[in-house]
């Protein structure tokens, strides 16, 4: 009695079908995942801006006003040395560190008239203005 030996493995046709199905899935799924990256970055920027705005409000409560444009957001991490000096700056600061926006650009802070400021991320293009993912993301204090 002789046994027929069958080799194990996949046929070329089976491999081609699997590759085709994987390629089809990749073309459907990839665009959806890629679009989520920009959405996630914008969401992170909004969250960062909210955290920085909260720290700015705490600074104002302690010192009577927001930091000047010249003092900038660094006044939330290290005690300002340029006038007007803070009256009651918290030991340890208001933030551990200044985050960069999700595109690696520093957030922009400008102190406006009495008790007001503008705070923003310049978006993916790191330039003023823009559309879509390049649009600026703003946070304002009334």
Predicted features and spans:
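Aliphatic-rich helix starts adjacent to a transmembrane/signal segment
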Residues: 32-50
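Conserved catalytic core of two-component sensor histidine kinases
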Residues: 19, 46, 53
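Short, surface-exposed interaction loops/tails
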Residues: 3, 38-43, 54-57, 63, ...
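Short, glycine/small-hydrophobic-rich surface segments
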Residues: 56-97
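N-terminal leader/signal peptides at the extreme start of proteins
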Residues: 1-10
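Alpha-helical hydrophobic helix detector
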Residues: 16-32
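Hydrophobic single transmembrane helices highlighted by the model
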Residues: 11, 15-16, 36
């Amino acid at each position: 009695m002789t046994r027929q030996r069958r080799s194990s493995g996949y046929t070329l046709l089976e491999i081609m079908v699997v590759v085709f199905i994987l390629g089809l899935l990749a073309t459907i799924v990839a665009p959806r995942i890629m679009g989520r990256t920009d959405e996630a970055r914008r969401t992170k920027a909004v969250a960062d801006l909210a955290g920085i705005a909260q720290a700015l409000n705490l600074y104002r409560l302690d010192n009577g006003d927001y930091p000047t444009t010249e003092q900038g957001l660094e006044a939330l991490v290290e005690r300002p040395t340029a006038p007007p000096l803070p009256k009651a700056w918290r030991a340890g600061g208001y933030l551990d560190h200044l985050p960069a926006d999700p595109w690696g650009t520093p957030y922009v802070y400008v102190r406006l008239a009495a008790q007001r400021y503008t705070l923003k991320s310049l978006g993916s293009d790191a330039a003023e203005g823009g559309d879509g993912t390049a649009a600026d993301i703003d946070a304002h204090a009334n």
